[in-house]
Amino acid sequence: MLNKDQFADNHFIRTIIEDDLKSGKHEAVQTRFPPEPNGYLHIGHAKSICLNFGLAYIYDGLCNLRFDDTNPEKENDEYVNAIKEDVEWLGFHWAGEPRFASDYFDRLYDYAVGLIKDGKAYVDDLTPEEMREYRGTLTEAGKNSPYRDRSIEENLDLFTRMKNGEFPDGSKTLRLKIDMAAGNINMRDPVIYRIRRAHHHNTGDKWCIYPMYDYTHCISDAIEGITHSLCTLEFEAHRPLYDWVLDNIPALHATRPRQYEFSRLELLYTITSKRKLNQLVVEKHVSGWDDPRMPTISGMRRRGYTPEGVRLFAKRAGISKSENIVDMSVLEGAIREELENSAPRLMAVLNPLKVTLTNFQAGKTQSRRAAFHPNHEEMGDREVPVSQTIYIEADDFAENPPKGFKRLIPGGEVRLRHGYVIKCGEVVKDEAGNVVELKCSIDHDTLGKNPEGRKVKGVIHWVSAEHAAEIKVRLYDRLFTVERPGAVRGEDGEYLPFTDFLNPESVKEITAYAEPAAKDLPAESRWQFERIGYFVTDRQDHGKDTPVFNRTVTLKDSWQPK
């Protein structure tokens, strides 16, 4: 359930919007989230989703979902459907039907013809290599193309023939006629159409020319009546072109949008480059785009992150124009905080040590009911069964305990969570000297009450061996061992492959034992394993006969670089 307190406040974009509404510049807020359907959304997109949809929600406006699909070779319906699912999972709903930039291809073409007629666009025959030479540098002005002064009639004829497929791919482009000496290289006669025979996921084979992003984006905003077009800071240098295109198409003046930029999110210990994420998938460093170690929304969902937790993280990351570098612990902290309130509890033992209760008596030794959550009675309770053999965590026992150790030791006592106080009477070892079993006695007068005359400080979790559910547990950790895996240089000054810094211990699969309540859980069921961490039944692999739990996050932030 959304509420207006869930979104970042007191940032400069909210100030702009409030001033615009107060002055009457806009009667209502209209934003958009415009992903390119060429990959899966990641945590950086989640921040943008929360910003655009959140602002529309806060100010009772609307937010469109628009696919910027101008690059047909890299785009497909798989990504379209995945993006829609991710946005909905985060808790947002777009205005009307999803929109596509390709829905506007006819209008984009007509506007380009209008620019040619106004002498503001021309067909160019320069090759990509020649165009780079003519463009100049940051310190040197560019040169006019020898085709820049073609007549309007010739340009109209050539552009029509480009559309009709009379020229080879890449042989001609349509460029805006702006200023080859402009200090901003983006304004040096940018290309707005290129010839590319490629099947398009939405328009099929209707077109063999496709518009460029910078031309398409601003026009799409205007067509949809977007009031505040929000993008990350790398597009700040593109804003003059955004404005130029809209200023020079009179039909769009009535719905003139404005572009505002904010800093993109850089999350440490991961990467968000689609190219690099794709490399991880292709080279099988991960199991897929939804691998729980990936920073994709689908990966985070499978990891057990909640929409509420991701929205809380986006709020804490904030919106500004300054560098937005955020440690992974901030994301994990937001998820941990949300799950602390929402996740019911179970006990599970990941590294079992057998304990025999020597004075167990059927009929006398009793099970006890325990709440699923200490603060939410509505979640109900369950029986925590006990039997003569139980499992505890191996590291909850120490023969030679360190100072301050409050768990089980030879001759010592400890309370079983939701159960009795037990005392260790005998330690059984194998031939190699490894502890394989403890023999302990139960104090039958301690079920639900403290023992008389002594204090037992330690409390440990456990499961009944007779009743336990055998489960598969995947212990996930950070995918990389360094903060910025894509920005590490070698001795020669060149960047090292980011895959050199993959964490070899980013996933470990073990067999564990859990309370019987774990046997019949549906997929994507989130739980706290008491004293261990938060876990989720795997979205893909979990089943009644093969329970699979993914570790979402530990109870505390104890991560150390390997």
Swiss-Prot record:
Domain of life: Bacteria
EC identifiers of the protein: 6.1.1.18
Residues holding ATP: E36, P37, N38, H42, I43, G44, H45, A46, K47, S48, T232, R264, L265
Coarse class of the protein's main subcellular location: cytoplasm
CDD domains: GlnRS_core
Binding residue positions for L-glutamine: D68, Y213
Motif extent ('KMSKS' region): 271-275
Assembly and oligomerization: Monomer.
Family: Belongs to the class-I aminoacyl-tRNA synthetase family.
PANTHER family listed in its UniProt record: GLUTAMATE--TRNA LIGASE, GLUTAMINE-TRNA LIGASE
Protein name: Glutamine--tRNA ligase
Organism whose genome encodes this protein: Neisseria gonorrhoeae (strain ATCC 700825 / FA 1090)
Lineage: Bacteria, Pseudomonadati, Pseudomonadota, Betaproteobacteria, Neisseriales
